[in-house]
């Protein structure tokens, strides 16, 4: 069975975090572990993370999302087949990771997968399906014009090896940076218009649905 490491950055996420963790750890047909970096929470986020055997958590200074995710990439164990990014307040469908893997498993070079999302309210009531305008058919144009939905990203070990070679001192968002690295190394892009994430919108979102509208 393939192994996937989920990279999760948290900050004061106690309210919705248990639901997210349960959905991630319930992924079917693939083994998952979670590497979580807490970005200076003052609530019970770290306490919740430590309750799960398959979650490894560490903390540090408040770096904000982009640099926090970069730190996760640099600290991630390279001995997994696949890697995925994760937001702290979403809910994943059980087939999320395996669906992505099936799209890139036969690619023998760095590969990056992204998908649409289901935008939901704080109670998981459906609002709309948000398709990604970034189809990666023209990667440079699409990344610059539409951005990239990092919470849907799944990528292979070959791309992780490339990402670990770079430590940018200035970065706007981690998901765009990952996309640019994949482009720079002539990687493979796959855009899936199916949605496997319930992308929760609420008053305390660190990153909101305007990035996926």
Task: Write out the residue ranges for each language-model feature.
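Nucleotide-sugar donor-binding/catalytic module of glycosyltransferases
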Residues: 1-211
């Amino acid at each position: 069975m393939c192994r996937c490491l989920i990279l999760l950055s948290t900050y004061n996420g106690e309210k919705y975090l248990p639901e997210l963790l349960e959905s991630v750890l319930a992924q079917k047909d693939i083994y998952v572990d979670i590497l979580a970096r807490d970005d200076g929470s003052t609530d019970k986020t770290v306490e919740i993370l430590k309750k799960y055997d398959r979650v490894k958590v560490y903390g540090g200074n408040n770096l904000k999302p982009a640099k926090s995710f970069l730190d996760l990439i640099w600290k991630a164990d390279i001995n997994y087949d696949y890697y995925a990014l994760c937001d702290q307040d979403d809910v994943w469908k059980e087939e999320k990771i395996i669906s992505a893997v099936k799209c890139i498993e036969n690619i023998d070079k760095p590969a990056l997968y992204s998908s649409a999302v289901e935008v939901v309210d704080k109670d998981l009531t459906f609002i709309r399906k948000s398709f990604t305008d970034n189809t990666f058919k023209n990667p440079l144009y699409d990344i610059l014009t539409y951005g990239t939905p990092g919470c849907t990203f799944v990528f292979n070990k070959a791309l992780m090896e490339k990402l670990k070679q770079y430590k940018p001192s200035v970065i706007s968002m981690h998901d765009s940076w990952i996309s640019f690295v994949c482009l720079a190394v002539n990687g493979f892009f796959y855009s899936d218009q199916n949605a496997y994430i319930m992308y929760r919108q609420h008053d305390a979102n660190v990153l909101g649905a305007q990035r996926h509208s």
